[in-house]
UniProtKB/Swiss-Prot annotation:
UniProt name for this protein: Sulfotransferase 6B1
Lineage, broadest ranks: Eukaryota, Metazoa, Chordata, Craniata, Vertebrata
UniProt function note: Sulfotransferase that utilizes 3'-phospho-5'-adenylyl sulfate (PAPS) as sulfonate donor to catalyze the sulfate conjugation of thyroxine. Involved in the metabolism of thyroxine.
Keyword Methyltransferase on entry: no
Family: Belongs to the sulfotransferase 1 family.
Top class in the EC scheme: transferase
């Protein structure tokens, strides 16, 4: 993941802010979407418009709790395999997080730059599309995503907790969580998944066959790796391997970022009524869409 000192320094500051923040005061709204005040500011969003993407930037777009830290590790290892240089993150890698001066500093960073983001498609800087940066879009089924949200808030010390799973579920379904609605994010990206510079990755596919999932990433980015290199990276990138070293790579929050990673963990918390509500929401927003088919909802979120 990121350079330990930079990553942990940013996370430590965010956790320190969280200590004094009640859940009811955790979010601010910018252009209609809720963001955590511990990680984002309106000044940084305003400065984001000045960000100048490069054609060889690698953008990792995902809704929160859908595997962004996992993909960051995988792409970093792919770059290392090609260049023989460990990828360094001079800034916290989430594009919209940090101070408003970060985009000026990023001009001096060497290529390729890895840029993670949880922004909806229409909130991304226009230069990403103008300069044809490569975009990996990572999705995870909405039921497990909601459960992961709940455990992150309620297990990590110092982060404001929800009173119950039912409370988190209500807020998740209304889109009143960090980075807004999962379904708005999905609807927004659905229209653009077939673009020449966009590659869709499903979290559940990586869990099922990590080596096959990893193999398609360098092919999309234009890297050549041998089968042996792919296999080595897949062994280093299993969820279990990531969890084992998470405290070294991500600091105290690491074990919570790599809590379980299981497909189907939602069954431990969802009531039958909540599952039906999620089914209806999915049908309303994504039934008959390209993304709806790619998410394999019937396989992962029903029964």
């Amino acid at each position: 993941m990121a350079d330990k000192s930079k990553f942990t320094e940013y996370i430590d500051k965010a956790l320190e802010k969280s200590k004094e923040t009640a859940l009811s005061h955790l979010f601010f709204t910018y252009q209609g979407i809720a963001y955590p005040i511990t990680m984002c500011t309106s000044e940084t969003f305003q400065a984001l418009d000045t960000f100048e993407a490069r054609h060889d930037d690698i953008v990792l777009a995902s809704y929160p709790k859908c595997g962004s830290n996992w993909i960051l590790h995988i792409v970093s290892e792919l770059i290392y395999a090609v260049s023989k240089k460990k990828y360094k993150y001079p800034e916290f890698p989430v594009l919209e997080c940090g101070d408003s001066e970060k985009y000026q500093r990023m001009k001096g960073f060497p290529s390729p730059r890895i840029l993670a983001t949880h922004l909806h498609y229409d909130k991304l800087p226009g230069s990403i599309f103008k300069n044809k940066a490569k975009i990996l879009v990572i999705f995870r089924n909405p039921t497990d995503t909601a459960v992961s949200f709940f455990h992150f808030h309620n297990d990590v010390p110092d982060i404001p907790s929800y009173g119950s799973w039912d409370e988190l579920f209500r807020q998740f379904m209304k889109g009143q969580v960090s980075w807004g609605s999962y379904f708005d994010f999905a609807i927004n990206w659905n229209k653009h998944l077939d673009g020449d510079n966009v590659k869709f990755i499903l979290y559940e596919d990586l869990k099922e066959n990590l080596a096959a999932g990893i193999k398609q990433i360098p092919e999309f980015l234009g890297f050549f790796l041998t089968g042996e290199q792919i296999q080595t990276i897949s062994v280093q990138s299993t969820f279990q391997a990531m969890r084992a070293k998470s405290q070294d790579t991500h600091g105290a929050v690491g074990p919570f970022l790599f809590r379980k990673g299981e497909v189907g963990d939602w069954k431990n918390l969802f009531s039958e009524i909540q599952n039906q509500e999620m089914d209806e929401k999915f049908k309303e927003c994504l039934a008959g869409t390209s993304l709806g088919a790619k998410l394999k909802y019937e396989s992962y979120c029903q029964g």
